[in-house]
Amino acid sequence: MKAAQFKWISTAAFAWLCSAALYAQETKTINNLDASSKTAYFDLETGREVTDTSDDWDIAFNRTTVLVNGGSSGKGQVTAALLKDTSFEQVTKQPANGFKADSDQEKAIPTGSGNGWYEYNMADHSISPIPGRILVIKSSSGKYAKLEILSYYNKSNYNSANYSFRYSFL
């Protein structure tokens, strides 16, 4: 009798651990977040854009600039690190260091072609995400999320500053 109970508990524990791991790595994809004429503020926990009067945002987009709600850009304690030469799938935990808040001199996610998440092509004047660049965001509640910018253009009308990205909590 005890062996059957032990097996049931082990099976239940295993199922719970599997579901917790799947939940932690659930990936959300956001398409065409419009940052062309205004700053678009985004709350990673709710998965929604929020108004500019809200303090409940983690990351914001303004044309090619990415902001975090910390330091000079906001009242939150959000920080970010830019990982290079990796993939979304390879990032399974937050890095030990490299997290920054925005400052007046420098953004947590560097700006300018080749410095941060994108490259500018002078021949056709396009903006393209650099493969292998992953943002890791530490929210003000202490949660970590990885984020990959997939596109800077609206796929239906090719308008610029319409971000598509995917993210998941670590």
Predicted regions and their residues:
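Bacterial Sec-dependent N-terminal signal peptides
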Residues: 1-26
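Generic alpha-helix signal with a bias toward terminal, lower-confidence helices
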Residues: 13, 54, 69-73, 156-161
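Compact beta-sheet-dominated globular domain cores
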Residues: 137-170
